Amino acid sequence: SFSHIWVQFVFHGVAGAGWQPLVRPPRLGGNRKMGVFATRSPFRPNPLGLSLLKLERIETEGGVRLWCGGADLLDGTPVLDIKPYLPFVEAQPDAAPGFAAVPPVPLEVAWADEISAASLPPPNRLLIEQSIAQDPRPAYQDTPQRVYKMAVDDWEVAFRIEKGMALIEAVMAVEG
């Protein structure tokens, strides 16, 4: 009956990429450097990651399966450990957020007229919209009319940002 869990994992998608003691956090515009331990960068001296996930349900038929929301993991991410989140132990109302004092505002997302969002299965459409709403562009790039591309699950998504709104211009299945 826990509502949230901690998931400790390995940043396997950047394994072997190396690390630097100073990184450029997107929340600072991508131009200012900070010590890697003061950030959530995956490029660390060890590949360990930690995420707090909403535990939506647990299935126990044929093994144990946890259904979670809010994951910032790649498919196939190696999970090392799972622990319950205990608000009375871990929630610190007087904690200082450092350089991330203001939460980011999600972008409004629209689909270009020539694209039929209805042709995508609803879970894929929702995943694409939620991913683009987080504004995945490099923080220092805010060029109107520039088309950005990113992989979301088995799709390549092309989008642009104009006046604080994301417009999805193309979605193509990626052959894998």
UniProtKB/Swiss-Prot annotation:
EC main class here is transferase
The protein's name in its UniProt record: tRNA (adenine(37)-N6)-methyltransferase
Q: Catalytic activity, per the record?
A: N(6)-L-threonylcarbamoyladenosine(37) in tRNA + S-adenosyl-L-methionine = N(6)-methyl,N(6)-L-threonylcarbamoyladenosine(37) in tRNA + S-adenosyl-L-homocysteine + H(+)
Q: A GO molecular-function term, please?
A: tRNA (L-threonylcarbamoyladenosine(37)-C2) methyltransferase activity
Q: Which family does it belong to?
A: Belongs to the tRNA methyltransferase O family.
Alphabetically ordered keywords of this record: Methyltransferase, RNA-binding, S-adenosyl-L-methionine, Transferase, tRNA processing
Q: Which GO terms describe its biological process?
A: tRNA methylation
- EC number, UniProt record: 2.1.1.-
Q: Which residues form the TsaA-like domain?
A: 1-94
The entry's function note states: S-adenosyl-L-methionine-dependent methyltransferase responsible for the addition of the methyl group in the formation of N6-methyl-N6-threonylcarbamoyladenosine at position 37 (m(6)t(6)A37) of the tRNA anticodon loop of tRNA(Thr)(GGU). The methyl group of m(6)t(6)A37 appears to slightly improve the efficiency of the tRNA decoding ability. Binds to tRNA.
The residues that hold S-adenosyl-L-methionine are 12-13, 40, 50, 74-77
